[in-house]
Amino acid sequence: MLLKELSAVASPLNDQQIDQLQQAAAESSPQQLAWISGYFWGLSQTQASTHLQSVSQPGVVAAAQPAGKLTIIYASQTGNAKGVAIALKEEATAAGIAVELVSAGDYKGKNFAKETHVILIASTHGEGEAPDDAIDLHEFLQSKKAPKLPNLQYAVIGLGDSSYEFFCQTAKDFDSYLSKLGAQPMLERLDCDVDYDAPAAEWRVKALAKAKETLSTGDADVVPLPITQSQQAVSQYSKQNPYEATLLTSQKITGRHSGKDVRHIEIDLEGSGLTYQAGDALGVWYENDPELALAIVAKVGLSGEELIDVDGEHIQLVTALVSQYEITSANPQLVTKFAALSESKKLEKLVADKNKLREYSGNTQIIDVLAEKKTQLSAEQLISLLRRLTPRLYSISSSQEEVGEEVHLTVGVVEFEKGEESRQGGASSFLSHRLEEGAAVKVFVEENNNFKLPADDNTPVIMIGPGTGIAPFRAFVQERDNREAEGKNWLFFGDRTFTDDFLYQVEWQKYLKSGVVQQLDVAFSRDQVEKVYVQHRVLEHAEQVWQWLQEGAHVYVCGDMNHMAKDVHDALLTVIEQQGKQSREQAEQYLNELRKSKRYQKDVY
């Protein structure tokens, strides 16, 4: 029943409470409504009565004092898993469950033997790797030291991207390890795709229901109840509640003969109170190209004027495609679904081969998938193929110590030709082509605690970032410069040509001249017959790299995950082998120890 109808019917709520709920609903996104639903479900399970106080005062509810404890462990690389874990903790507390929230990096594996109920929330990093904070726990649970866990009930939820081969691999690993140790699953593992908010909220409700079946509760106690988004919005912006910032600058920083269009983006955060650290990312909520939306509906025989239901509202199909759905990048699920709808022999053959399906999906835009076989679809069928729109995360390329209430990005514009037609990336073309300077753009800061400068300013730093992977290192050097850090800085940068692709060249030369950067080594792959990349420069300076490592240097790598990061990793192993006189196995262990101690950090994509 709609909230606006409540006052007209018999209801346990008074008019003031109805007004509060109406306000909360009106100011909340679909994801926030899903969270609120789970939160109020938890309250309904308590034995104590609840009382909603005025929104202008801190709200409290009576919640049952539990007997027994639920431990929530999160393994998070960029913060998404942590966010889900925090929401679950709040819902569990409201439901009267004693709960402990802990990072996988702070959790001792041997403590599993003392637990009765555990929920583990895990993201996956790189190629099926556990997040940095979870490496030790991940290794412990598959080791001979792991205890048998016959008295443990557990649940696992994974966050990932189904476009990648090792989708939610860390969550799958934890699920498998706990099961082999004799623990009993409370419910089936959920593997969430990029649009995880709603399914994760539903799963949390089910998980808490299962936990409460065997976690008893006692007398009521008072716990805080933050009931509206607007109460939190005063001091904090987030993915669900982004800040409406202003685009100050979108400047092309590659030369006229470059095959790339890379933009330096400056965004005004004045008055927002938003803060960030070097290494964090900026989430950008973007809109799709209206022309692309119209082309897609035409491709499947629709006009775009059809009305569809989106979160309880009826809106035109083309409007939904512009603002609510991902319509640029294909994914394996979309290709699989369209293969079934279109009965395309080509797509059916691709679907039968997972590797070819993943390769095709990663290199093909949605409109080109739809063009594989002319197929009439209904508006509902088209929508069923699509993911919900999610924000694009960009590594921040500025330090607030340097730029104040601004945030800078370094954005590579995705643009290529498909036959006689042009194809563009959704977010990059929005920032570079469709958003005018002075226009509003919704943003939020995504913390990345796994890509941070060393706390000790005397520590040497080695930064390896070709192409737009240079972004966080611009922030790092600005930060170290403003802090007058004594530690040495060494930058490896690479791209196609010196003349047209040396991003921020003047700035690096200034830092080199002033002594902020002690060493700058570049690799321009197309300036000579033989291709040279950053990993080659690392090997050329193997002796010095090893010396810096012996001095305690931290190593950072940012950029392409599929090729560059692997090649740099192999180069570092070779340096350790040759200069440290170690076997390959010992070199791998050495590098793994660097990663565990936060001396080897990667921000790859």
From Swiss-Prot:
One of its GO terms (molecular function) is flavin adenine dinucleotide binding. It catalyses: hydrogen sulfide + 3 NADP(+) + 3 H2O = sulfite + 3 NADPH + 4 H(+). GO terms for biological process: cysteine biosynthetic process; hydrogen sulfide biosynthetic process; sulfate assimilation. Its EC number is 1.8.1.2. Keywords: Amino-acid biosynthesis, Cysteine biosynthesis, Electron transport, FAD, Flavoprotein, FMN, NADP, Oxidoreductase, Transport. Its cofactor is FAD; FMN. One of its GO terms (cellular component) is cytosol. Residues 240-454 form the FAD-binding FR-type domain. NCBIfam families: cysJ (TIGR01931). This is Sulfite reductase [NADPH] flavoprotein alpha-component. It comes from Photobacterium profundum (strain SS9). The gene is cysJ.
